[in-house]
Each structure stands twice: as structure tokens, then as C-alpha cells.
């Protein structure tokens, strides 16, 4: 494959856009550098770049594009919105329809509020939890990403259940001191944190199924134990379902795992590809939000008709029979093939898969927490990524990210992908 136009475009972008990208995850820094491929068109399971190369896409825009690119039902809804005016600054009937759909999907949502991104949704759930409890500290799990607000750009401290340290320049230490970071799937460390700071904790922020250091499921009983211990201390449980909602099951991870949070943050899939976020939860907690309560949150673009209509259309597609069974079937086919080729070429990998999403780790170890994911072979992944890209398979350029299947993928796409995996593993072993 030739990437001449992508390389030219990246050089031009560097002159005008910071780092040449509008999100650092789009750069190729984590896979050894180089010019990121610039895409020009998406349709179904495929991308075409500015050089005319075609790719089978497993990035899915980091998760939102579960229906495939340019799904006709969603495209029709967006066109309708464009023709009717994309922004009013007033209530609309569509936002009521969409709120009802989210509540029907997730019974933990008594009340809902729309925002513009997953970052906003998480940020606001924390504010609401603090308003409701009168406390300030938050517990999060190491390696879990909850957006780029100061409140959650916090890394683990010097050991389990410690106060965090800023994970970005510009985040004050005073903010990091309000965040306690513990290892995921480690209930003893969680108990230790609550024993030490429980009376100061407003909420625990949880990815019920981790999606940001790969796909990592909670151990049996872990989430329920977290719920029970948190409530014993008078704190709230916030589920960050920005990735997981409507990805593994229509009702989200909380339905799949049969656990119920106090507050939920949503994003990605619920916009059908357009910018959106939402948060919701128990009525008495959500009534802390203005104009009913003292916790302020607002947004010019919040609930805009384009994103709302796109989201409604997306959920209408996902509510059809057999969607999640189909994603699981394709995911199993992909996982089995990857493992078979790894065994054939004696390449050490572990695959974590849940239905239509999976992560390939270059390690023999079973991954259940961030420390293990961090210790996987990033150099080997970088080589694998570039070998796959050169064969027309588009993956996320990071060892921590998932492969996301869409309902547009076919068995033929999986077979073509596995042929590329076979050749990539062969070259990795030879070199």
C-alpha cells in the first residue's frame, strides 16, 4: 500500500493543528510514530483513505460506530435534522422520545439529562454525587479512562488504595488529592480505601466492563461487592457506560451483569456517530441538578436535534432481533481464528473478548487489571499494527484498545482479516 497523500496531509496538518491530530489517540506515537492514515470515506465495515486504499475497520471510531459507517437509517435521520435546523436552543419533542428510550433500556435511569460528550457526562455525575452527599473524594480504578476533565485525569499513587497523582500537566495536585485510585478487580484494596477514607467519599467511578486498557471483565461478584461496600459508607456508585452501553447488550453492562448503579454516564454509541453524552440515575439524586437543585450544568449544544435524532435512529437499529447474537457470533469467529494462528506460529498472545469486542495482548498472562495490561509487549503490538495496516486492516494504534465489530461486518470480512493475521504472525515470528 502507498500512503503518499496521507503523509502529505499529515505534514500540512502539523502546520495548523496541534500535533497534526485533534485527539492524541489518533497519532501513531504509541506504535512507533509515523503519519497516521487519513480516511476519506466510510461505508459499512469499510474505510477508504485519501490514497484510495480500502480497509476493513475495527476501530469503529473507538466504539460508537456499532451499526457500521453511513448506516442508511441513521443517515436518513441526520438528513432530516439538517433540513429542519440542527440547533434551536429550546426543548424539542425528540429529546423526550430519546430520554424515554434510554430509560426503557436502563431501569436505573429514573431521570436523564443530555450533554455533548462522555467527558461531560462523567464530569457532571461527579458534581451531582458531591452535591448529593456533601462529600468531595472520588474513588476510581487504575487504568480506567473517564474523559479528559481535571477530575479524572489522575493516575495511581505509590501503591494500592493511595491518593492519586496528576496524569496530565495542568491538573492541580489539589484536585488529584480528591481522587483515590485502586486496582480493578481487587476487592481487598477497595475495602482498604473505604476503611481509610470512606466518610469522605462521595462516589466510586466504575467502568463495569473495562474498555480502556483492553476489554477486561469484572471477576464474579466484584461489582456487587463494590456496590454493597460503597453504600455501607453512604457513598454513591457511578457507572461509566460511555463505551459499554449498547455495546454488549441493549441494556448496557448493568443489564448484562445484573448490577444497578446510582448514576450512569453515557456517550459514544448513543449518538449514532454524532457528538453526544447523557447522564441519569435515581430521581432523588438527579433532582440535585439545576433548575431543580443546586448542582449547575448547562450546554448550548446539549440535546441538539441532529445528535438526538441520530441517537434515536441508532437505538432503533440496535433494538432489532438478533443484533447482539450476531456480534457475538462474529466475535467468536475472530477470536478463535486469531488464537489458532498464534498457536500455529508460536506467538504468545492472550485474547480478552466479550461478544463483539476484543483485545489482543502480546503476553501469555491472563489480563485482569491495568498493571498486567501495562506490562504486555507494546513493541510487538506496534509491529503487528503496522503489518495489519499494510494489509488493509484498520485497528486502533494502541496496545490498550479494543477491536470493535459492527453489524456491517460479515464472515467474509472475518476470513480476510484472519488471513492478514496469519501473515502478520508469520512475519513477526520470522523477525
UniProtKB/Swiss-Prot annotation:
Its EC number is 5.4.3.8. Pathway: Porphyrin-containing compound metabolism; protoporphyrin-IX biosynthesis; 5-aminolevulinate from L-glutamyl-tRNA(Glu): step 2/2. InterPro entries: 4pyrrol_synth_GluAld_NH2Trfase, Aminotrans_3, Aminotrans_3_PPA_site, PyrdxlP-dep_Trfase, PyrdxlP-dep_Trfase_major, PyrdxlP-dep_Trfase_small. It is found in: Cytoplasm. GO terms for biological process: protoporphyrinogen IX biosynthetic process. It catalyses: (S)-4-amino-5-oxopentanoate = 5-aminolevulinate. Its cofactor is pyridoxal 5'-phosphate. PROSITE patterns: AA_TRANSFER_CLASS_3. GO terms for cellular component: cytoplasm. One of its GO terms (molecular function) is pyridoxal phosphate binding. Pfam families: Aminotran_3. It is an enzyme of class 5 (isomerase). Belongs to the class-III pyridoxal-phosphate-dependent aminotransferase family. HemL subfamily. Homodimer. This is Glutamate-1-semialdehyde 2,1-aminomutase 1. It comes from Bacillus pumilus (strain SAFR-032). The lineage of its organism: Bacteria, Bacillati, Bacillota, Bacilli, Bacillales. The gene is hemL1.
